[in-house]
Curated annotation (Swiss-Prot):
UniProt protein name: Phosphotriesterase-related protein
Keyword ATP-binding: no
Protein species of origin: Aedes aegypti (Yellowfever mosquito)
Entry cofactors: a divalent metal cation
Swiss-Prot/TrEMBL GO biological process terms: catabolic process
Upper classification of the organism: Eukaryota, Metazoa, Ecdysozoa, Arthropoda, Hexapoda
């Protein structure tokens, strides 16, 4: 029987997960992506978030060392409150995408799941090469695949908040990160992911480099190594493939197409100087186009929260933004509740189910 593996154990009936965010972070080390602030602005961004500087930090989120520290106690307290709010607003599950290289925190995921009664799925896999130590980049494809298999089938021993020891199993591989061009290590990670997926029939999710050709190249490598398209999510398409024609061409490959930066609206995208960050309105337009072209069963939505300023405690929208603000806008555009449920409940459950 197909199940979904969460940090607190298997869910025998995947459809009971409820509303699911398929790409979030509850804790991670993102300091590698710090960007020096523009001249004269360091005095505003290099301090705690206040009413006086939050505007600067929203514009230059990666230029605040405080903001990109998403693994301190202050962040964890704020995340806990936001997940509680998410539950109160109708949320059922969160897929936590922090993988090896950015400091996954399984103990925290378990404790938050227990405290909030929200299903949380943890991921294995490797993030981009730039955050990996040499000991990891020298791993063989077989060693990487063995690690993924172990963390899915047998789990990792963790001490919980109740001073008990438990084995936490991962419920997917991801996010598997790659740059552009894709490095040799990242190609190994993609191949190891595909080979493991082929054996376990587990769900996987990829983080593409910031180039419109990156998603298709990842899928090519993944399929050639034996991975199944219908168990694969391509993340961040809203910031990667901006042209609707190109997006439809990618959709033909058969993966889930994820629009996971809802709530991120800024006039300058620091991590891609030659591109731009679409608005929520543009994300909705892309989803409308996908629905009109018959891809209702391939669309997923999320926020990819990974900096403090997007949590409600620090003036952000939190994990409830889609529930509170976007679903209403979808309804006003004539997208019926059945379609919304397919995108936010049925599609995630179908992607996450596996027989283990």
């Amino acid at each position: 029987m197909a199940k979904v593996m969460t940090v607190r154990g298997p869910i025998d009936h995947p459809e009971t997960l409820g509303f699911t965010l398929t790409h979030e972070h509850l804790s991670l080390d993102f300091h590698h992506f710090y960007v020096a602030p523009p001249p004269g602005l360091d005095v505003y961004v290099n301090k705690k978030i206040t009413l006086q500087n939050v505007g600067y930090i929203r514009q230059y989120p990666y230029s605040s060392a405080y903001n990109v520290n998403f693994e301190d106690d202050e962040t964890h307290d704020a995340v806990l409150k936001d997940v509680m709010q998410y539950k109160a607003c109708g949320g059922g599950a969160i897929v936590e995408n922090t993988s090896h290289g950015i400091n996954r925190n399984l103990k925290l995921l378990y404790n938050i799941s227990e405290a909030c009664s929200v299903h949380i799925v943890a991921g294995t896999g490797h993030y981009v090469q730039a955050v990996q130590p040499d000991s990891v980049t020298h791993m063989t494809i077989e060693e990487m695949g063995d690690l993924y298999t172990k963390e899915i089938l047998f789990g990792t021993q963790v001490d919980t908040a109740a001073n008990e020891t438990t084995m936490i199993k991962c419920g997917m591989i991801g996010e598997v990160g790659s740059s552009w061009p894709i490095t040799s290590f990242e190609k190994k990670a993609i191949q190891a992911t595909a080979e493991t997926q082929c054996v376990l029939n587990c769900p996987v999710t990829f983080h593409p480099g910031r180039d419109k050709d990156a998603p298709a190249e990842i899928v090519r490598l993944y399929l050639e190594a034996g991975g199944k398209a219908d168990k694969c999510v391509m993340s961040h398409l809203d910031r990667t493939i901006l042209d609707h024609g190109d997006l439809l061409e990618f959709a033909k490959l058969g993966t889930y197409c994820q629009f996971d930066l809802f709530g991120t609206e800024c006039s300058y995208y620091q991590l891609n100087n030659t591109g731009y960050m679409p608005s929520d309105e543009q994300r909705i337009q892309s989803i409308e186009m996908m629905l009109q072209e018959g891809y209702e069963d391939r669309v997923l939505m999320s926020h990819d929260i990974h900096t403090k300023h997007r949590l409600t405690h620090f003036g952000g929208h939190g994990y409830s933004h889609i529930l509170n603000n976007i679903l209403m806008r979808l309804s006003l555009r004539g997208i019926d509740i059945k379609t919304v449920d397919n995108i936010t409940i049925k599609n995630p459950a179908k992607w996450l189910e596996m027989k283990v």
